[in-house]
Every structure is written in structure tokens, then in C-alpha cells.
């Protein structure tokens, strides 16, 4: 049992360490002008979406004495409405960033691949938002600790799968093999998605949302830079993600229908 626990802790730490290898991304940014422009574009979008409205409302609140919460709600309602469109562009840019690397892939990369993966990423993001809201509605007021624990586990699975899904797609790894990797290396992916999940849980502040989006920009391109981890032997029990496999399968089926229609 102690040997299994040691292997689990080792993989969790390994995944966590890989998720903070920002130095690798910085080296790429320093040497790649195209990548720099895309990251700057993402930062500009986030600044317009979150930082500017926050600065305006904060300044207004500290300037006037009367209640301006209704104005704040209107401002952030507008931000949330256009956020959907922003994230679609945002994920397309992220996938384009991934495509510029010279990692050996099993098939050529097309623009249609980028658009399809961007749509899937957007659907993942929307699905996670709905799931988190449902968990809060059912558990938060009664079992807040349980609510946070469930959200954390789900979010780590989401973030790690979302980040590695692009690489697996371009390596032509089928969906069942992707799920199998996640089931066998769940401890590694738990560590990889830890920071992003904690940010997401506490992303009720514009500054945290801004930080989360910039961090995710790096987290999604890192799998194309770091050494990919594959299960060599079963060092600890795997988990069952068949439900996740079914959901992802439906998304991929929808993308195939879109590709065939074009």
C-alpha cells in the first residue's frame, strides 16, 4: 500500500511540476515572433473583457457615495454575454499557437482541425460552467466542503484532458485511447490540473479570471513542449471515466458531422 501511495504522490508532483514549467513557454516566446503576437492578442482580449470593466466600476464606486451595484451588474452582464464569442476566438488562437510547434505529428494540421478543436474546447468550457453551477445549487449551502471537493476533482479532469486533447488529436490517438491514458495516469493529470482548477473555483473576481485565462494560454501549449508521459506499467489502480468517454464521444461525433458536411 505504501508503494502505491508513493507512486501516486510521485505522479501528482510530476504533473504539478509540469504545469508550472512556464520557463519553457517563455523561451519559445522569446524566440518566436508569431507566438509572441498571439499571446499578446490573448492578453489584450482579456484586458478588454475583464480588467477594463473592473477598473471602471472600481473607480466609479470610489468616486460616488451612492449605490451603484445595479450599474456594476449591467457591466458584468454585458461582459458575460460577449464572453462566449470571446472564448471561441480565444481557443482558436490557442490552438493556432499549438500548431506552430515543430513537434513530430502523425498527420498534417489543417485549419478545419483548429476550428473543430476550438469548438470542442468552447463546449467543454460551457459544460464545466453549467456543472459547477449545478453543484453549487445542490450542495454549496448544505455541504460546502463536499461541494468544493467534487468541483476540484471534476475540474482537474477537465483541465488536464482539455490541455492534452489537442496533442493527442494531432498525434491521431483515438478517443478511447485518450480516455485510457487519463484513467491510468489520473494522478499525473490531477497534479497537472491542480492550479488551473483552484483558479477556476475562485474565479469570481475579474483579476482572477484574467490570471486564469493567461495561465490557461500557457497550460494548453505546454503539452507540445514537455516530454509526454505514457503509462509504462500499472503503478497504482486506475479510475473509471466511461461517462466522460461517452460525453467526449458525442462531441467528437458532432465534429465529424460538421467536417463531413463541409
UniProtKB/Swiss-Prot annotation:
Coiled coil: none annotated. It comes from the Viruses. Keywords: Membrane, Transmembrane, Transmembrane helix. Its main location: membrane. GO terms for cellular component: membrane. It is found in: Membrane. It is a multi-pass membrane protein. The chain crosses the membrane at residues 42-62, 71-91, 115-135, 145-165, 185-205, 206-226, 235-255. This is Uncharacterized protein L211. The lineage of its organism: Viruses, Varidnaviria, Bamfordvirae, Nucleocytoviricota, Megaviricetes.
Amino acid at each position: 500500500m505504501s508503494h502505491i501511495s508513493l507512486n501516486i504522490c510521485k505522479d501528482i508532483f510530476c504533473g504539478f511540476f509540469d504545469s508550472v514549467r512556464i520557463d519553457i513557454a517563455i523561451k519559445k516566446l522569446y524566440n518566436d515572433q508569431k507566438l509572441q503576437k498571439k499571446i499578446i492578442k490573448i492578453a489584450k482580449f482579456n484586458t478588454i473583457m475583464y480588467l477594463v470593466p473592473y477598473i471602471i466600476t472600481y473607480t466609479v464606486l470610489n468616486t460616488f457615495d451612492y449605490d451603484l451595484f445595479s450599474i456594476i451588474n449591467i457591466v458584468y452582464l454585458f461582459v458575460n454575454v460577449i464572453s462566449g464569442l470571446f472564448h471561441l476566438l480565444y481557443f482558436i488562437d490557442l490552438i493556432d499557437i499549438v500548431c506552430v510547434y515543430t513537434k513530430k505529428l502523425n498527420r498534417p494540421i489543417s485549419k478545419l482541425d483548429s476550428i473543430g478543436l476550438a469548438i470542442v474546447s468552447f463546449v467543454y468550457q460551457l459544460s464545466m460552467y453549467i456543472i459547477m453551477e449545478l453543484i453549487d445549487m445542490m450542495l454549496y449551502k448544505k455541504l460546502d466542503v463536499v461541494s468544493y471537493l467534487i468541483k476540484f476533482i471534476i475540474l482537474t479532469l477537465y483541465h488536464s484532458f482539455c490541455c492534452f486533447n489537442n496533442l493527442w488529436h494531432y498525434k491521431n490517438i483515438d478517443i478511447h485511447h485518450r480516455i485510457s491514458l487519463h484513467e491510468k495516469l489520473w494522478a499525473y493529470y490531477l497534479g497537472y490540473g491542480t492550479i488551473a482548477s483552484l483558479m477556476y473555483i475562485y474565479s469570481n473576481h475579474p483579476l482572477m479570471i484574467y490570471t486564469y485565462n493567461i495561465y490557461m494560454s500557457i497550460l494548453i501549449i505546454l503539452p507540445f513542449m514537455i516530454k509526454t508521459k505514457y503509462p509504462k506499467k500499472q503503478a497504482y489502480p486506475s479510475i473509471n471515466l466511461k461517462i466522460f468517454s461517452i460525453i467526449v464521444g458525442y462531441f467528437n461525433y458532432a465534429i465529424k458531422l460538421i467536417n463531413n458536411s463541409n
